[in-house]
Each structure stands twice: as structure tokens, then as C-alpha cells.
Amino acid sequence: MSDDLQGHRQEIDRIDDQILRLLNERSKSVIEIGKLKKQRDAEAHLHTPAREAAIFERLSKQNTGPFPTDAIRAVYREIMSASLSLEGPQKVAYLGPRATFTHMACMQKFGSSAQYLPSRRRLCVVAAILR
């Protein structure tokens, strides 16, 4: 393996280590924010779509490439999904069985860390969330 290739791989490893450290640092802040929200209002909604949208918008505008903006959104969808799960289980009910369009749409919106609850009828979707 060439020295150039090895050097680039070592640089990627170093960057990956930084990303991991920063993700854990971000997670600690998320946990603290969750505690503050619960102190202010025990019934507080942990998921704040407006805040998510603002983050996506800010990062999209900041991106100068070459990493694709659509990929940034997908990466941050998973970061936010995992972050929300640190604050408590995120239940998402959807109509139909697993791997249907509704299930896939929910996964695209809420990420892979949410707890997905399939339902056969629309009324069951509401009941599943309330459980």
C-alpha cells in the first residue's frame, strides 16, 4: 500500500475519532436539555420539529461540499433520532405492516432509533401511541 494511501486513511481515522468524540459531547448536551425541559414542564414534548428544521436549514446553508447536502440531512436525521432516544423512547405508530410505504416514510422522518408500532386501523395508530 502506498504511503499516500496510508496517510489518507490515517487522516480519515483521526477525523472519525473526532466525529465520535463530538457526537458523545453533543449527546451530553442533549441529555441536559432533556432534563431542563422536564424540569420546566413534566409533559414537555421532547421532539421539537421547528428546532430540527432550523438545524437542517442552517447546516444546508453552511455546506460548501464536497459532502452532498442531501446526505447531511440523512446523517443528521440519524443523529437526531439517536439523540431523541437518549431523552426517552420515541414511539411512532403507522398504518399497515412493516416495510410498507407508511413504515418507510416514518423511518425517513424519525430515523432508525425510534420505536415503530405497526397498526391495522387508523384508530389503533392513536391507541398505540398512547400506550
Protein language model features and the residues they cover:
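Domain-level signature for soluble enzymes in the chorismate/prephenate branch of the shikimate pathway
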Residues: 1-131
